[in-house]
Amino acid sequence: MEILRATTTAGRAGAYYVRIQAMARKHQIPLDVEFDEHDTPDTKYIVAVDNYLPIATCRLYAIDDAKVMLGRIVVLPEYRHQGIGTLVVKEAETWARELGFTTSVVESRDNKIPFYESMGYVADMEQKIEGETFTCFRMEKNL
């Protein structure tokens, strides 16, 4: 298994594949909701691949000069609970630091908060985000 920075069309296609399989299909999320205004040519993606097949992803985009949003973090169901999500997030954080960001932000579903807390993120339970599909809470970590 490899954790890659998706800097090519093929890499981005891998990120999109994982999101379609694990989110759009599973939760019946329309593509124009899953792929939103933050999926731009400047958006960065991390992709985990196993035997050349994409199995996990994360996207990164700037909130401002100091903060980066890590989002659409997803691992295909058959690969969950093997530490792959942690590896993907850690690579995204490394890339964000290299790009000059000092704070990482995630918007986590409530049942995933312990996952992010295990990596040093702190939840702000006052910042509840009612999305079209899920209710999430903002979490931050100093990079």
Set out the residue ranges of the language-model regions.
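Conserved beta-strand in the GNAT
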Residues: V47, L53-Y61, M69-V74
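C-terminal "cap" of GNAT-fold acetyltransferases
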Residues: R109-D110, I129-L143
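Conserved acetyl-CoA-binding loop-helix of GNAT-fold acetyltransferases
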Residues: V75, H81-T94
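Short, solvent-exposed loop/turn elements at beta->coil junctions and helix N-caps
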Residues: D32-H38, E126-I129
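Conserved GNAT acetyl-CoA-binding A-motif
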Residues: V89, A96-R109
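Conserved acetyl-CoA-binding loop of GNAT-fold acetyltransferases
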Residues: E117-E126
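A conserved beta-turn-beta hairpin within the catalytic core of GNAT-like acetyltransferases
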Residues: A62-G71, R80-H81, E130-T135
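Short amphipathic alpha-helix that is part of the acyltransferase structural core
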Residues: M1-V33, T40, Y45, V49-D50
